[in-house]
Every structure is written in C-alpha cells, then in structure tokens.
Amino acid sequence: MDLLQPLNLPPYPFKITEHNGEYTLFDELRKKTIIITPEEWVRQHFVQYLIKDKGYPKTLIGLEGGMKLHGTARRTDILVRNNKGEKVLLVECKAPSVAITQGVFDQVARYNMVHKVPLLTVTNGLQHYYCRIDFVNERYDFLEELPEY
C-alpha cells in the first residue's frame, strides 16, 4: 500500500487501525488519533527518529505550529526547542511523492525568517537534507546527518 510505504528512516511500531478505508494512528505528541496522509506518515516517522535515534525529548517537540508570514497564516511541521525554550530545529516534511526542490528550500527559509532556528531539515521520508545556519556570518552549511540532541 502506497500510503504506508517504507521510508528511508527506521521502522517504528505504530498502532495503525483501518476503518472504512481510512488509516489512523495515535499521535503520542498531540495525544489524539489522526488520519494518516503521506505527509503525516513522514512526519510521524521523523518525530520518532528525533526521539528514539537522536535523543530529542518529546516534551520539547511541537507539531504543526502556527505562525504569521507577511500577514498570512502558515504552519511549521516540526519545531524543536531546547530546555531553555529556545528554538533549535525546524523540520519541513513532504510526502514521499514530492520532490525536494529549490522551492521547498525556499519555503523553509521563509519560515526561518520568522523562527530564526540554527538547524533546518527538509525531508520527504526518502531524502533528508540537514542545514546549519550561521546568522552572524550570514551563511549556511549542509550537514551529512542531523546532530544528536
């Protein structure tokens, strides 16, 4: 089934249920059952990757946070803070069928004009790009992998 396709992330034991052709899972961060879309499948895997493989505390991970950009409401997929409440990681998730293009990078860069986060990630579950932003020297560097928390 394409909806639950394997991703380039470790598999996690989600509790998936099917009802009338819709698949759902329990989102442990939002504490509710959600419908699985291809983008949500990627988001849920990446959240588990952050928690289980990279050591990010789940209490510091926010999902689909609202923000205003040039007067328009937007939503970030994943925003992680440190224990001081400072934003440290912004993740933009796309469905596996969505190519990671310059337009996707432009989108996350626009979001980061608001958030000013030092680590950015763009993923479609198959490809992952990690970037460290140096605001002082106005530059960025792509990273081979996401740093541990």
Q: Can you say where each PLM-predicted feature lies in the sequence?
A:
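A short, conserved, highly charged catalytic patch centered on acidic carboxylates
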Residues: 1-119, 126-149
